[in-house]
A protein has these predicted regions:
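N-terminal hydrophobic targeting signals that begin at the initiator methionine
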Residues: 1-2
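A composition-driven surface/loop motif
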Residues: 5-14, 20-532
């Protein structure tokens, strides 16, 4: 079974990468084109209006759907435009129904005990936020069968896409998803019986608040190609058991802002082609992992985009296989403690292009670094202390700093999000065997750029399983690939990472500053928590 899943994972990645460079289609003035390759027209759409008392169809159309009170079931192919406000309603696409376009055109839909939108097994559905429209979907605490086992209607997500469903979320309007039950958006698996499953997000302005579990959770292929996403989650911001693709070659999108989460982006195979990504997490910002660490080739590949990652008590980028950075701009800050590593991989870390600044407490247990593009390393390269212990600092939190070449030219400048005892820097401007000086306040630290295989310590540092899996391989009860409500995986020494505001993170405000605001640059001490 694990071998089959590995093959499916590889096939899904190949298909998604093949589509990565697709060009936008010509604009057709007779249709609305929210994104490349996605067209819809309201001319022949069935218009359905929700109210608290029921659903009405414009012009008396009565084909392709069924109405039961405030529950709408779509039974046939076509375009359905939904609007209105309802305090307890739902939309369901019947199993096996394909060719469905669901246009949200000013819809505010809440459901009391199930998912506001459910795409059943083997469906093909495009959910479009109409141009300029503002839409919202909200569930209740009862939409969680872990907490309410007697609720047979619970779907554990605001938008539930079941096994074998192929769903695209797109449009030039906005959609706010509030998950009071469990997940924001949940996509199912590819199975022999139900067919291939996938979830794609394009162009949409998507806001997800998930105070219980994940914002987006997929069991198969998840493509976030473009759009603007703002996410706050108790657990993962965006998770896929298998393949997660962010962006597309030759494009600028998407823009992803994660204001709070446990882990940021997580998948067995995580690929970032483009985008502007800003993640604030309490554990790993990027994680190549899933709930089962056997039978997969875990990879993290970054070829473009701008990524700013800040972890208060975890690693920056953590791969249970190889980690490759070949382009883009990557800035990572992790808390200045001995067990927080900005870059961590079981396999080889390869830097062959782009601009990389990775700063944190230390290089942990060390890393196997292939510097195809030269890099300069400052500070701790080993254990450096007991897990959780604070390190002396090269830079203090909030300090302005520069990295200069031998002629005094700045090759990088910035402001520290937290104190850091370990800094790795690489860019196209760095020349092997040349000297570079890190300057912060009145202090300076010398370094020499290296290339080829670079050893930073005592060997590779292993990551932990994704999705809440404990190191001993035992999943928690009611396991669905993610952590149960509020739990955190144990570290080998039994220490559990601290999380802000109790068990669930909340959007930070001034996170990471000491009582007096900041430590002075170069004074040898530092805040241990990155600033927001």
């Amino acid at each position: 079974m694990k071998k089959l899943l590995s093959l499916l994972c590889a096939a899904s990645l190949a298909l998604s990468l093949a589509a990565c460079g697709a060009q936008a289609a010509d604009t057709n003035t007779n249709t609305t084109e929210p994104v490349a390759g996605t067209f819809y027209s309201l001319e022949n759409a069935t218009v359905l209006t929700f109210t608290d008392s029921g659903i009405t169809a414009q012009d008396g159309s009565d084909t392709g759907y069924e109405i039961d009170g405030t529950a709408l079931t779509i039974t046939g192919a076509g375009t359905y435009a939904v609007t209105g406000t309802c305090a307890d309603g739902s939309i369901t696409v019947k199993k096996g129904t394909t060719g469905v376009t669901l246009v949200l055109n000013g819809l505010a839909l809440t459901s009391a005990d199930t998912a506001p939108i459910t795409c059943n097994k083997s469906t093909q559905v495009t959910i479009v936020a109409a141009e300029g429209s503002v839409n919202s979907l909200t569930d209740s605490a009862e939409n969680n069968d872990d907490e309410y086992p007697d609720n047979e209607a619970a779907e554990n997500a605001v938008i539930k896409c079941k096994d074998g469903s192929q769903v695209t979320l797109c449009g030039t309007g906005s959609l706010t998803v509030t998950a009071n039950g469990k997940n924001g958006i949940k996509s199912g698996a590819t199975t022999a019986e139900e067919g291939e499953a996938s979830l794609t997000i394009r162009e949409l302005t998507l806001i997800i608040n998930a105070p219980i579990n994940d914002a987006i959770n997929a069991e198969q292929t998840l493509n976030v190609e473009s759009g603007t996403l703002t996410i706050s989650a108790a657990d993962d911001a965006i998770h896929s058991d298998l393949v997660l693709n962010i962006g597309a070659e030759g494009t600028d999108g998407p823009t992803i802002t994660v204001t709070a989460c446990y882990e940021g982006l997580e998948a067995a195979q995580l690929t970032i082609c483009s985008g502007d990504i800003n993640i604030t997490s309490s554990d790993d910002c990027l994680n190549a992992a899933n709930s089962d660490l056997s039978g997969y080739d875990f990879t993290m590949t970054i070829s473009g985009g701008t990524i700013t990652a800040c972890s208060s008590s975890g690693d920056g980028f953590d791969s249970n296989g190889d980690l490759t950075i070949s382009g883009g701009t990557v800035v990572i800050w992790t808390a200045n403690t001995a067990d927080n590593e900005p870059l961590d991989a079981d396999g080889t870390i390869t830097v062959s292009g782009g601009t990389v600044l990775a700063a944190g407490g230390s290089s942990g247990m060390g890393m196997n670094l292939e510097a195809a593009q030269p890099c300069v390393i400052y500070g701790s390269t080993g254990f450096g202390g007991m897990p959780g212990s604070t390190q002396s600092s090269l830079i203090a939190a909030d300090a302005d700093f520069t990295i200069e070449d031998a002629d005094g030219n700045a090759v990088y400048s910035g402001t520290a999000r937290c104190g850091a005892n370990f800094i790795l820097f690489s860019s196209a401007d760095v020349v092997a065997d040349s000297a570079y000086t890190l300057k912060a306040g009145d202090s300076s630290t010398e370094g020499t750029a290296q290339s080829g295989m670079v050893s930073t310590g005592m060997g590779v540092g292993g990551g932990f399983p994704g999705g809440g899996q404990k190191p001993d391989g035992e999943p928690p009860e009611s396991f669905d690939g993610q952590m149960p409500n509020g739990e955190k995986p144990e570290l080998p020494d039994g220490e559990v990472p601290e999380m802000p505001s109790g068990e669930r993170p909340t959007p930070p405000s001034g996170q990471g500053r000491s009582a007096d605001g900041s430590a002075p640059a170069g004074d040898g001490t530092s805040d241990t928590t990155p600033t927001a």
